[in-house]
Amino acid sequence: MCRNQQLCRLDREAAPEIYALPGEWVRNKLPERIAAADAVILSDYAKGVITSELIRQVQAFAGPDKLVALDPKPRPGLNFNGLGLVTPNRNEAMLLAQMVGAGTDEVFPPEEVCRRLHERHATRLLVITLGADGMLISREGRIEQHVPTAARAVFDVSGAGDTVTAVLTAALAAGATPEAAV
């Protein structure tokens, strides 16, 4: 840390293949774990645990009334159609929408990004985090609200997206509206 900012981060990781969930665990343990939960959050930093098939299984085990949320890390072919909450950051949203300029903050047409993400994935609720610019709440591919941020002294933004997904999911599972949850 220097002047309240993280200077360096070093991650050492093994090959993604070790992260795959055993099929037996998914069939035998996952349904009971989901049944005991008020909501489910899927997040794996694109390590290979979250697959289109696992998302389908989680949705089936959760049923239509239990919130399933995804903090997406874009990967080719990942299908997350019909999830209750998806919380990409600006760059992830651009990549998921397959838009030119993805990965930069220079070009971000929010209406088009939200429309494309809804068309491709039919998410019920999309909340795009925009860093210092706040968050966008979108339903049915339309922006419903832009929530600005309040200035704060931030020492480390690592895990900010995880925190947003966890807090939104907990609030929504407890009955809050998306606007109140944000």
Question: What do these predicted ranges mean?
Answer:
Residues 1-41:
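Conserved N-terminal subdomain of the carbohydrate kinase-like
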Residues 8, 133, 166:
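Glycine-centered loop/turn positions within well-structured domains
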Residues 12, 88, 149-150:
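Active-site donor-binding loop signature of nucleotide-sugar glycosyltransferases
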Residues 15-17, 47-48, 154, 175:
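Short strand->helix junction
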Residues 19, 95-98, 154-158:
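Short, charged, surface-exposed secondary-structure boundary motifs
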Residues 37-43, 135, 161, 168, ...:
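Buried hydrophobic positions in well-ordered alpha/beta secondary-structure cores of metabolic enzymes
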Residues 39, 47-144:
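Conserved phosphate/ATP/ADP-binding segment of small-molecule kinases
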Residues 124, 130, 150-182:
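Conserved post-catalytic alpha-helical subdomain immediately downstream of the catalytic base
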